């Protein structure tokens, strides 16, 4: 699966941007006011730039997608829930047969 550049949730267009690194050093963010998911291609760990794998980028996309979806539903998804859901979605795509 490839990360989309744009998609709709609740009839709102969400733009996806891949950047080299976020100032926060997070893997990704969702900005509900600007309707943008931003995904970092790298993070800094112990003063070392670590390039994220395709799997990590996809997992981050789904994590932020869950936050975007929940914003339009009830805005109460915790980081742990978003991470769990994104893990399950990635596992579905990685292990499907046929």
Specify the residue positions occupied by each region the protein language model found.
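Catalytic zinc-binding patch centered on the HExxH motif and its immediate surroundings
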Residues: 2-8, 17-40, 46-48
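Well-ordered beta-strand scaffold positions
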Residues: 12-14
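Short pre-active-site segment immediately N-terminal to the catalytic Zn-binding motif
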Residues: 37-60, 72-73
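Short active-site segment of divalent metal-dependent hydrolases/proteases
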Residues: 62, 66-70
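Post-HExxH zinc-binding segment in Zn-dependent metallohydrolases
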Residues: 73-98
């Amino acid at each position: 699966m490839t990360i989309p550049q744009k998609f709709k949730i609740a009839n709102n267009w969400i733009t996806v941007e891949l950047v080299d690194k976020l100032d926060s050093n997070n893997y990704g963010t969702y900005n509900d006011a600007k309707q943008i998911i931003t995904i970092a291609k790298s993070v800094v760990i112990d003063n070392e730039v670590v390039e994220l794998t395709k799997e990590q980028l996809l997992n981050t996309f789904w994590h932020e997608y869950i936050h975007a979806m929940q914003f339009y539903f009830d805005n109460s998804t915790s980081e742990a829930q978003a991470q769990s859901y994104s893990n399950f979605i990635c596992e579905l795509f990685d292990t499907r047969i046929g």
